[in-house]
């Protein structure tokens, strides 16, 4: 009963997630968007199957195909078969290719494994599927997967692949094997290198008309021996003896999902001789081959890796003004998972960069993680039929604007508050951008230091600030008064590095105001241009007004 309840909950959660991401389109808009993406994928299919080339990365193709299926389900269309092979394959498979059902996560895999035994895990090698038919000890036929029942005659091509044994003996002398033709790699680390479009490269080599030495760059991983020995260990031993050594090397017995997860993670990070996109868990006990049909395999499932890069829908384009006045563009995304990290926003860069990318809400972009786990845009993989871009704010801001609050200064003003509260400046732990916005919205700050006047009662009654944290926040605000003079000057945005400011030995506001351009220019890392910026900064009316206000608050170094 518990198992069925868990399955029911999983189904309901899955359905809820699908319903939640259905686009808010009119029927006409939905028809147009679905039709455009369908045509593009059909073109990619034709290129892949008929010409053996691919204009799109395998991962992008897979994810956009899934996106198309999602849209079709949302709007009542008939979902397409992913990667539909050509219909002219005429060679019957002795045993049908079943395909493999995908598990959405570890919990789903655990449910599937719970009622099964004698289970084994193998890498899900990323290439193209093939049937190898041996008769009287010789390779008699090689057939592409096709539609699972019929495929193309690949015998001539496969006979040129040195990694495929042309003769076998013993139980394999009259056998049918199913496996994956893959691109041989030396020390391929999936976590670091990704899929490298391996599937398309293999398909390209197999589709070309000319026989090339490049076929020797291919290998084969046998993952099924229909009607073979009952014991998996016997199967693996016979395959290894015949020359299919990789199958034995990369097939391990597993008892539960935790063990599968450990192997999956190991292979994700290990040096392997092929590209993978997950693992396959299979039972050693299989039905007789005459019962095998496409889409009917209940004895094996796949648990794929999260793609290194994910296709994400752009929900909105937002503009942010930094403390220096520079306008940056941020894309809000429909949430995607990257390496266990939920990504909902990605920085595009400057307005000019955004215009070069040509990104609008509704577009599909490829997102990955750069150094230190920071999301980045790799490509725009699909643009919507209807595209409306927001207008960026006027470029009226600079490093000397928005110390005082106003309607037009909202974003730069908040950026200044976030900066001064950071660890390297005044160290106001416990408050970030959301907290500053809540304080400013409630108490309408006059300038960037107005928070010094807030009382414990005001903080406690601020919407968005937890009452349990308001006392701590007031305490930190009070402690900030004792920060060194140089920290307060940094909070005011002086255009100097901390090292240069410390080297100046400035200890009071009056001393700083009387320092000359020549004085600043002598500091380490400070040239004539930076020295002029310091002069402009200290002579700015807003800066002078802030200095006077801090003096009235008896902040160290600002007292008359």
Swiss-Prot record:
Q: Which reaction does it catalyse?
A: NAD(+) + (deoxyribonucleotide)n-3'-hydroxyl + 5'-phospho-(deoxyribonucleotide)m = (deoxyribonucleotide)n+m + AMP + beta-nicotinamide D-nucleotide
Give yes or no: UniProt keyword NAD: yes
Give UniProt keywords alphabetically: DNA damage, DNA repair, DNA replication, Ligase, NAD
Under Pfam families, the record lists: DNA_ligase_aden, DNA_ligase_OB
Q: Which residues form the active site?
A: 124 (n6-amp-lysine intermediate)
Biological role stated in the UniProt entry? Catalyzes the formation of phosphodiester linkages between 5'-phosphoryl and 3'-hydroxyl groups in double-stranded DNA using NAD as a coenzyme and as the energy source for the reaction.
Q: Which family does it belong to?
A: Belongs to the NAD-dependent DNA ligase family. LigB subfamily.
NCBIfam families to which the protein is assigned, alphabetical: PRK08097.1 (NF005987)
This one is known as DNA ligase B
Q: Which organism is it from?
A: Escherichia coli O139:H28 (strain E24377A / ETEC)
